[in-house]
């Protein structure tokens, strides 16, 4: 037994709602959740944190911009369910074309274990990276979130440059395994 409350939820590879609670809390510390514009970038097919966050943000009428390598898009079942419920989901293939409009950029890693070989993984993993140059000219209050573990998706120089934009590393707010 534990002397502190424990929240444990999820279904393995599909959802990670306890991480979403932390993400919503982090965003809410900086801005209201209602109607925000959120970019979901990375492995949206297998990234269970992105699945849960998309569902949660739909409750706040957020506009979701999805950006992922081919084959790692947000699952159709999630996209269909959310759009049928009124959530605006806009697919993009270039983060630089929309980043200035975003309130939040949620970056997930490309999961190496999902690829048959290293060459395939590196080809996809190198398709995007958050750099200081990419973030120049964004909203002053843009929040960049990453659920961890972080690989090379965010240039370490960007972490040193924060804020602005505020790059939140969840390890400061009790990470969720």
State the predicted function of each range:
Residues 1-28, 151-154:
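Phosphate/diphosphate ligand-binding glycine-rich loop within oxidoreductases
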Residues 5, 63, 141-143:
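Proline-centered loop/turn at the N-terminus of a beta-strand
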Residues 6-9, 16, 40, 91, ...:
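General beta-strand structural signal in soluble alpha/beta enzymes
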Residues 10-14, 69-71, 169-174:
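Short, acidic/turn-prone active-site loops that include or flank metal/cofactor-
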Residues 15-21, 75-77, 175-177:
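Short, charged, surface-exposed secondary-structure boundary motifs
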Residues 29-107:
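Glycine-rich phosphate/diphosphate-binding loop of Rossmann-like nucleotide-binding domains
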Residues 82-159, 164:
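Rossmann-like adenosine-cofactor binding region
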Residues 158-177:
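C-terminal helix-to-coil terminal segments
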